Amino acid sequence: MTAKSKVVALEHVVIRFSGDSGDGMQLTGNLFSDSTAFAGNDFATFPDYPAEIRPPQGTVAGVSGFQVHFGHKPVHTTGDLCDVLVAMNPASIKANMRWLRPGTIIIFDSDSVTEKALEKAGYADDPTVDGTLADYQVVKAPISELTKEALKDFGMDNKSMLKSKNMFALGIVMYLFNRELDTVYKYFETKFKGKDQVIKANRTVLDAGYHYADTWELFTNTYRVEAADLDKGKYRNITGNIAAAWGLMAASEKSGRPLFLGSYPITPATDILAELTKYKNLNVKAYQAEDEIAGIMSSIGAAYTGCMAVTTTSGPGLSLKSEAMGLAVMTELPLVIIDVQRGGPSTGLPTKMEQSDLLQALYGRNGDAPLVVIAARSSAGCFYTAYEAARIAMEHMTPVIMLSDGSLGNGSEVFRIPKMADLPSITPPLAKANDPDYMPYRRDEKWLRREWAIPGTPGLRHRVGGLEKENGKGNLSTNPENHQLMTELREEKINRVANDIPLQEIYGDKNADLLVVSWGGTFGTVRTAVEGLMEEGKSIAHAHFDYIMPLPRNTEEVLQGHKKIVVCEINRGQFAKYLRMNFPEYKCEQFNKVMGLPFTIGELEAKFNDLLK
């Protein structure tokens, strides 16, 4: 680095990598995130890409982005406006104009400017010279040509050389933030093991980008974000889907029940299935079924045999699984259903996030078929939510739906790997061999749960199925009084789970003028917006719900004592409707967004300020 570059310390930074779907922006963002983790920063990421595998190149609709928000203090959100934009073509600038703050550094591949590229992006003239970007710091670099120049002696064709241009851009950004290149080198060596030429080519381009930024003095300042004050422990960069997979494995180990996953690939939940297939050595059985129904039915069968059973899906698949979920309710078998929500209805927006499956999760089954519903609040938190879903399912002999979403599942955060000894115990109610008083639907008095009778255990022969059962004995029954009793017992069993979950916390003054209510993946942005207004002296508090069905038993106390209540969610008000149904005496305002994008801190603060007037 030249002596002329001044190193400026920053509290936090938001970087957005943006280009065509084939430009490798997801990989570039992930590699920078890995370097961020090794630098000791706290961070959160937001991948944003089209639903098409190869959308039209050079168009705004085809832009793929990856945002990283990192800092030396706790980071709860993926960031609103970006401080640095890496734009690989004109369409990337067009697509991201609304995410730029005054003074944003735009690192732009000047080789991408052609008449056709400008036309596809909707520009009449080059935005880097016509004044469109006058409020920003535009750093133009001939990234494509310099990539080819760096690889001229490798005997590669033009198309192959340009596949590495994202590494040139990454090199520039690594220089800008004073990052060591070792983490990227290590990735090359692992990813391309045995392909020395490929490793050398990528290293060459990465180095070329780094040294170009240095030699040509592209930046007046470079930047450094000091390491966050993190608790001692082992950390890694983890996505929500991988965190969920790990949480399931931890629950399996803790409970002593083998893990079985029966699932069908669906965006954005597939990575859970893909991750669990790697752990056959840990007695994980992952079965890729031919469809959604086969996936959940295989899991119900596995639960019957004593496995910790799981199925994963997204909104359309949850609809297909509805009848089978009713079977799991009727048989009272432990089952975890993970729904990584996406934009709907129907096929909807497969790669975009939404929270619109809540009412389906609560009520989307025929008959009165209650089950437990909980929601993850962060990518790293998916580990603990999956673990808790498995604990409740096995200890209370019930299906549990865990709600995540695309931004949590694909986004990543710093994750401190916990010690098994620090995780809550999981003790399933296993039936004992040769129990002379055993009956399939005999229940304990405290939780109303039936015992888990593992097939093959002496003296525990029994039948299960979808027809109504006689209380206690478990025989088929169409008796009206018995059906009334069994329906009430199944409902009360779920209600009693409220005695086994934490009380609802409220952040801030319990009698604040405005109570902000949220659930699921909106936690980070809502909490950050509330904290900002608290610092201004505003009378505001925040209640974020992780447990949906049943609600925490002190929920009504939390809702009391406020002039206004506003429920923030990425749907048209489903949790607000649910609260009104359970607590009709409390008036809830709504703040909803259904654009396939998370809330921004700015729009939340504007809404809260308006309600506080």
Where are the regions that the model predicts?
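Thiamine diphosphate
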Residues: 12-101, 246, 251, 259-260, ...
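Short beta-strand segments
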Residues: 69, 87, 107-109, 139-142, ...
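Gly-rich Lys/Arg/Thr-decorated short loops/hinges at beta-loop-alpha junctions or inter-strand turns
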Residues: 51, 149-151, 218-233, 251-258, ...
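Short glycine-rich or small-residue beta-strand-to-loop segments that form or flank ligand, phosphate
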Residues: 13-20, 169-171, 259-262, 309-312, ...
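Short gly/pro/ser/thr-enriched loop/turn and capping motifs at secondary-structure boundaries
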Residues: 50-54, 113-117, 146, 293-295, ...
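A glycine-rich phosphate-binding loop feature that marks nucleotide/adenosyl-phosphate handling sites
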Residues: 49-50, 188, 205, 226-230, ...
